[in-house]
Amino acid sequence: MRIGVIGINHKLADLKLRDALAKACQKRFGANQSVHDQHHFILLSTCNRTEVYFSSHDLTATHSYLLSILRQDVKEDFDHKLYSFFGMDCFSHLTRVTSGLDSAIVAETEIQGQVKNAYNLATTFLCLPKELHFLFQKSMGIAKRIRSELHLGRGLPNLEHAILQTGKYFFRNTQQPKILFVGASEINRKILHFLKSKQYSDMTICNRSEIRSKELAILYGLHLLPWCQLDSWHQYDWIIFGTKSSEYLIKPEKNFIPADNDKLIMDLCVPRNVEPKLGQNAKITLLNIDQINRLLKIRHRGMTQALIEAENRVNLATYEHTNRYRQKEDSKITIFAASA
């Protein structure tokens, strides 16, 4: 199979470098940007990883092409922080990723939707080669089956629990903090739903799409803050950012910071939505996705045996599907040669 991937994740690089590479990849390899002659790409960008999957007749040339483009936009030395996989190793990697086995929060569920969205977005804008269709369709199918059969992650603390516990501790002397959600992403919707079930009622949504904001406001009984009024974020106690943006949405020098009460800001995004320098303000506690993920290390200890079994199933399934693919391609060549 002529497939490969080049990527960076939470294990290998800090947020600063991941920010820079995520912005460069979105600019150069986003679905509506990815017309690159004979090279074909699918970009998978989440808070914990940025990966470019590719297919071409010359994988080595495409790999070099990718690196040369990234070096134009990212000044920091990054080559030693990247990982690359080709062929069946690439297939196995994406299946592990989609299963949640390679996530910062082991066996998290959001990654399945993120992989599906990346694939669907690419197919909307691009005519992809059959190898990339095979890679994503099979990876999603295998991952779904493994998660279902092994019940991965069920009953264990997840990101919503970590966010709730952090908020409860921070606002232990506040009965109903004013909460602002910036963005209607899947993770923000899950957190919103979870906090609502825990009797948090003073919640506001701010999103680029007014239609989506109104839908969520009706569904959960939320207040609305128009996107053009995001600069008034400091009127809230607890601000949770979960939206895509190539630029910081709030910066220290741009926004007035009142001194009356402490703020808890959670930035769940890569690239980040919040300028890190904002955390230097004595009245602001700014937490990024890596800091929140560290609260959930207990998940891994509670799932050791299931994770081993999941890894074995990934390896077996990708091996079997790769062999079938090769046999099918070989039979086509044989038939073509016989008819020539």
UniProtKB/Swiss-Prot annotation:
Q: In which pathway does it act?
A: Porphyrin-containing compound metabolism; protoporphyrin-IX biosynthesis; 5-aminolevulinate from L-glutamyl-tRNA(Glu): step 1/2
InterPro entries, A to Z? 4pyrrol_synth_GluRdtase (IPR000343), 4pyrrol_synth_GluRdtase_N (IPR015895), GluRdtase_CS (IPR018214), GluRdtase_N_sf (IPR036343), NAD(P)-bd_dom_sf (IPR036291), Shikm_DH/Glu-tRNA_Rdtase (IPR006151)
According to UniProt, the reaction catalysed is: (S)-4-amino-5-oxopentanoate + tRNA(Glu) + NADP(+) = L-glutamyl-tRNA(Glu) + NADPH + H(+)
Keywords per UniProt:
NADP, Oxidoreductase, Porphyrin biosynthesis
Molecular function per GO: glutamyl-tRNA reductase activity; NADP binding
Q: What class of enzyme is it?
A: oxidoreductase
The entry marks the following residues as binding NADP(+), namely G183, A184, S185, E186, I187, N188
- The residues that the entry says bind substrate are T46, C47, N48, R49, S103, E108, T109, E110, Q114
Task: List the residue(s) that the UniProt entry marks as the site Important for activity.
Answer: H93
Q: What's the superkingdom here?
A: Bacteria
Its BP terms in the Gene Ontology are: protoporphyrinogen IX biosynthetic process from glutamate
Entry coiled-coil feature ranges: none
Question: HAMAP family per the record?
Answer: Glu_tRNA_reductase
- Other remarks? During catalysis, the active site Cys acts as a nucleophile attacking the alpha-carbonyl group of tRNA-bound glutamate with the formation of a thioester intermediate between enzyme and glutamate, and the concomitant release of tRNA(Glu). The thioester intermediate is finally reduced by direct hydride transfer from NADPH, to form the product GSA.
Q: What does the record say about domains?
A: Possesses an unusual extended V-shaped dimeric structure with each monomer consisting of three distinct domains arranged along a curved 'spinal' alpha-helix. The N-terminal catalytic domain specifically recognizes the glutamate moiety of the substrate. The second domain is the NADPH-binding domain, and the third C-terminal domain is responsible for dimerization.
Q: Which family does it belong to?
A: Belongs to the glutamyl-tRNA reductase family.
Give the function comment from the record.
Catalyzes the NADPH-dependent reduction of glutamyl-tRNA(Glu) to glutamate 1-semialdehyde (GSA).
Provide the assembly information: Homodimer.
> What is the protein name for this chain?
Glutamyl-tRNA reductase
User: What lineage does the source organism belong to?
Assistant: Bacteria, Pseudomonadati, Chlamydiota, Chlamydiia, Parachlamydiales
- As recorded in Swiss-Prot or TrEMBL, the protein's gene is named hemA
